Amino acid sequence: MNILLTNDDGIHASGLRAIYNELVKLGHNVFPFAPTVERSGASNSVSLNVPLTTQDVYDGDFKGTAINGTPVDCVKVGLAKLHENPPDLIISGINAGHNVGTDILYSGTVAAAMEGCVAGIPSIAFSRPREEVDPTQSYAEHAANLLKKIDFSLVPKGQILNINYPSISIKKTLGIKVCAMSTQGWEHKLHKKKDDNGKPYWFISPYIPYSHGISQTDVFFLLEGWITITPLMFNMTAQTTLSNLEQHSFT
């Protein structure tokens, strides 16, 4: 397959380099387009009215393109550069840190995959624990081999797969669980501080681990020790409310 590879951790991130190596080993043609620097939390943002520049990156057997933009910018530029031979698949990751629950709303990793499905291309987001329970290469090997087992005919256009690895060794995982997104996530605490000149500023604290929360969802199963696969879609229409409001009179 021709695969467009991206992330939000940046072109030099170990997760991107590791899965690049594994995909190439399996015979895929891999084209990395990733941010020049880390852009975690960029979500679906794009760089409007800002020049986007590209730089070829060579490092041993690795060849990729660094872009001074967001993860979504990287997918857009990548698709433009590959327009004569479009990718069969877009992979975003492997991210350093889980993207489950409400974190999905902020995730540049998931947003990059979502941009792929907006373009009509099958897309997957991979995330591992922030702490390296296993070497990054172990997650990459598993992720690359998992691709062989995914039946993309079961994933309609306009949807992606969001895959997360739990904070235990891959060998100790309970297996793979297909599940829904939780409405629970990390708690973000704001701290008001002052710089050396006494000027106040705000700082978002490091993540606070979530509790098990809502049963049968990605957060729940991840904490139980499962690898989670959650199908997501960019059409955010609330169908039940839509139907109810259609029956409502606004006159």
Swiss-Prot record:
Q: Which cofactor does it need?
A: a divalent metal cation
Q: How is its cofactor bound, per UniProt?
A: Binds 1 divalent metal cation per subunit.
- Record keywords: Metal-binding included? yes
Compartments, as annotated in UniProt: Cytoplasm
Annotated positions binding a divalent metal cation? D8, D9, S40, N95
Reaction catalysed by this enzyme: a ribonucleoside 5'-phosphate + H2O = a ribonucleoside + phosphate
The main location is cytoplasm
TM ranges are none
Q: Name one GO cellular component term.
A: cytoplasm
Q: Family membership, please give it.
A: Belongs to the SurE nucleotidase family.
Any idea what job this protein has?
A: Nucleotidase that shows phosphatase activity on nucleoside 5'-monophosphates.
Name of the protein in its database record: 5'-nucleotidase SurE
Which organism's genome codes for this protein?
Lawsonia intracellularis (strain PHE/MN1-00)
By which gene is this protein encoded? surE
